[in-house]
């Protein structure tokens, strides 16, 4: 399962970290993410408030 975590704060970091440990997770993206998340997720340079860009990214990486 591919997962996109939207945000850059501590809660999103904790959620992304938990997802990264799942055997079901095949790809993990964080938008915009933070340096800590970059250790276990692919951070993409999309603002968490840019809904159109987030939807486009999710559709392209389905």
Question: What are the roles of these predicted feature ranges?
Answer:
Residues 1-62:
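ATP-binding N-terminal substructure of ATP-dependent carboxylate-amine bond-forming enzymes
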